[in-house]
Design a protein with these regions (language model features):
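Bacterial N-terminal signal peptides
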Residues: 1-6
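Exported/periplasmic ABC-transporter solute-binding proteins
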Residues: 7-34, 40-43, 47, 51-57, ...
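Short active-site segment of divalent metal-dependent hydrolases/proteases
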Residues: 63
Length: 239
């Protein structure tokens, strides 16, 4: 038993907001083949990952979908510092291709789309920043009251997106990065939501206290031109 304990203790863990999965998988593969370093990577909703860190989970680096969660952890003394903004995310509306929905931001069209949808998929707004952005967008468009009784919540942005991909919900909201990924684009059309229709999705990452050097190196690599190029290719702006 003592042996397996030490193995667990030495394996560094990076926790990542679910919207970053396609980009992070690509960055990690590149990093692993360049350095031979391996980590455990766990994907989830930013708020859920934050709660686990507050409860003492042995995570070393938190790559969030927003700034609020990492800055709260920093204030509470869980992190090395306030971390760095590594990406600016974009929100997208998606529709299952089999449902014959033509996505549009024109007031009348959008109202019709929301009215005719029996379910609207989004990630839980209290734990998932992209779910929060979706609520802000619908509020700004004056459609929140029409929409809110139809919300089908995913535990994180991946599961919310999947509702639309499999047709359990005709429409939903996701990260633009996931909307353009091959797995999603095959089964769902997307519409990029203009940035001025929700609060900016500034994504911040923070090192949790006493990180192993291997994780500090990876954190620095995430700010490198190579990593930034991948993040950009996945539909984010980089600071």
């Amino acid at each position: 038993a003592s042996l397996s304990m030490s193995v667990v203790a030495s394996s560094a863990t990076v926790v990542v907001a679910a919207n970053m999965k396609p980009a992070m998988e690509e960055i990690y593969q590149q990093y692993k083949s360049a350095t031979g370093q391996e980590f455990r990577i766990i994907y989830g909703a930013s708020g859920n990952l934050t709660r686990q860190i507050q409860q003492g989970a042995p995570f070393n680096l938190f790559v969030s979908a927003d700034e609020n969660f990492p800055l709260a952890l920093s204030k509470e003394g869980f992190t090395v510092d306030e971390g760095k903004v590594y990406a600016i995310g974009r929100l997208a509306m998606i529709a299952n291709k089999g449902k014959g929905i033509k996505l549009s931001l024109k007031d009348d069209d959008l109202r019709k789309i929301i009215t005719s949808a029996n379910k609207i998929a989004l990630a839980k707004p209290d734990v998932a920043p992209y779910g929060k952005a979706a609520v802000e967008f619908l509020t700004k468009m004056g459609l929140i009251n029409l929409a809110k009784d139809k919300f089908a919540y995913g535990e994180n942005i991946s599961s919310a997106t999947n509702f639309v991909v499999v047709g359990a919900a005709p429409i939903g909201f996701t990260a633009y990065s996931l909307a353009i990924s091959k797995e999603v684009a095959r089964d769902a059309d997307h519409l990029l939501i203009p940035e001025n229709l929700h609060e900016p999705i500034r994504q911040r990452m923070v090192l949790i206290k006493n990180p192993p050097q291997s994780v500090v190196d990876f954190y620095n690599y995430l700010q490198s031109p190579q990593a930034k190029a991948i993040i950009k290719a996945h539909g984010y702006a980089v600071p």
